[in-house]
Amino acid sequence: MRVLVSNDDGVDAPGIKILADALRNAGHEVMVVAPDRDRSGASNSLTLDTPIRAKQIDMHTYSVAGTPTDCVHLALTGLLNYDPDIVVSGINNTGNLGDDVIYSGTVSAAMEGRFLGLPAVAVSLVTLCREGQQAPQYETAAHAAINIVAQLKTDPLPADTILNVNVPDVTWQQMRGFKVTRLGNRHRSAPCLTQTDPRGHTIYWIGPAGPEQDAGPGTDFDAVRNTYISITPIHVDLTRYQALENVTRWTDRLTAHMDWPT
């Protein structure tokens, strides 16, 4: 398969290099189109008010001065002279669990691929970030990715589906298997951090994500915590169907009291 690989950690991040190498070793034709620097948290942002520069690093790699969404959009709408078969985004250097997916550039790169008609997978390694911990097990996440891509080739998903994959940071031998999960969610984010710069101006840092809230059995949080690879099928229909009836009552009342033109 012809695989387009992107990420949000940047073109030089170890995760994307290990992922691209693993896919090539599995027999796939791989093109990397990724941001020129870390663009974590960029979500689905698309650059519309300035031109975007793309630099070809080698025959199989482009560095783009833009967001993860920019990278995939450019790759699929003119940068490449062929059409890839699938988009794989990652390997992110931390998890994208629960409502993390709203902000994730890793997930958004995959989402853009799906918007433009391709199967798409986002792969994240849920690193533990403990002092003295061994190096992140990117090879484990890459091994999971190539197995998932193989399944997608033989048994495709519906056209509106993205796979959000979160891999525990352990060796492959320590892994307990795959689990299909739903997204959990977190409590409200921690407060922003306030500091004073050398000129006496107040500056702010976004605070850390909130702790787990909905993280019980069946969620992505629970699977990873129990050393399973979490696979969550997601899609981008944001309609809250359960609220349609209630909001319809509102609009009926509003319509009845408005002097609409005939």
From Swiss-Prot:
Matching Pfam families: SurE (PF01975)
Subcellular location: Cytoplasm
GO cellular component: cytoplasm
Enzyme class, first EC level, given as a word: hydrolase
Molecular-function GO term, any one: 5'-nucleotidase activity
Alphabetical keyword list: Cytoplasm, Hydrolase, Metal-binding, Nucleotide-binding
Catalyzed reactions: a ribonucleoside 5'-phosphate + H2O = a ribonucleoside + phosphate
InterPro entries given in the database record: SurE, SurE-like_Pase/nucleotidase, SurE-like_sf
Cofactor field: a divalent metal cation
Co-factor binding details: Binds 1 divalent metal cation per subunit.
Record Gene3D superfamilies: Survival protein SurE-like phosphatase/nucleotidase (3.40.1210.10)
EC number(s) given by UniProt: 3.1.3.5
Record: residues binding a divalent metal cation: 8-9, 40, 92
Main location group: cytoplasm
Biological role: Nucleotidase that shows phosphatase activity on nucleoside 5'-monophosphates.
Family membership noted in the UniProt record: Belongs to the SurE nucleotidase family.
PANTHER family referenced in this protein's UniProt entry, alphabetically: 5'-NUCLEOTIDASE SURE, 5'_3'-NUCLEOTIDASE SURE
NCBIfam families named among the record's database cross-references: PRK00346.1-3 (NF001489), PRK00346.1-4 (NF001490), surE (TIGR00087)
Name of the protein: 5'-nucleotidase SurE
Record organism: Xylella fastidiosa (strain Temecula1 / ATCC 700964)
Organism taxonomic ancestry: Bacteria, Pseudomonadati, Pseudomonadota, Gammaproteobacteria, Lysobacterales
Gene that this polypeptide is encoded by: surE
